[in-house]
Amino acid sequence: MGQHLSEESNKVEIDVAELQEWYKKFVVECPSGTLFMHEFKRFFGVQDNQEAADYVEHMFRAFDKNGDNTIDFLEYVAALNLVLRGKLEHKLKWTFKVYDRDGNGCIDKTELLEIVESIYNLKKVCRQGQDDRIPLLSPEQVVDRIFQLVDENGDGQLSLDEFIDGARKDKWVMKMLQMDVSPGSWINEQRRKSALF
């Protein structure tokens, strides 16, 4: 999520200087050495928007690999690496993990609808003061269309394989499943701002 999911974003090596820059930024932003949920929400500006906060909480949990309710520097680097230059398949697996709210290995219509609604609301928060165009499809219509195109066996659930295959086969599905809230753009903007001071 974040940067657009594309096959070409597959650079995996992290430059040592870049890693040092990330560490300096992490220490400034998180002097305790860990990033807590409330700080993560603040970064995305969603403290007062419950639907958007729900989505950001799921993103946080997906990045919190060891489940200790914090993101340490290694998890932070892994998250940035995924968002900024991860391979398509890794990004899709991570996106699937965010969408699979109950962790059962499948995404049902309710789970997908909750995420799509949260992202619609988050995009409204991110666009405050900008053109607030009404989406062409409602969240329900988006979910129904995704299931029509991706649920190959018709069981009312999307498996990881269906999710990845559906995204690869159909550009519209890819766009809808990535539901880009631009954390990569946000991260780059924060890095630019800090470089100015």
Swiss-Prot record:
Question: Which one GO biological process term can you cite for this protein?
Answer: visual perception
Q: What are the lipidation residues for N-myristoyl glycine?
A: G2
Q: Which domain of life is it from?
A: Eukaryota
The record ties this protein, via InterPro entries, to: EF-hand-dom_pair, EF_Hand_1_Ca_BS, EF_hand_dom, Recoverin
Q: Where does Ca(2+) 2 bind?
A: D100, D102, N104, C106, E111
Q: In which tissues is it expressed?
A: Low expression in retina.
A GO CC term attached to the entry: cone photoreceptor outer segment
**Beyond the main fields, what else does the record say?**
Binds three calcium ions.
* Job description of the protein: Stimulates guanylyl cyclase 1 (GC1) and GC2 when free calcium ions concentration is low and inhibits guanylyl cyclases when free calcium ions concentration is elevated. This Ca(2+)-sensitive regulation of guanylyl cyclase (GC) is a key event in recovery of the dark state of rod photoreceptors following light exposure.
* Protein name as annotated: Guanylyl cyclase-activating protein 2
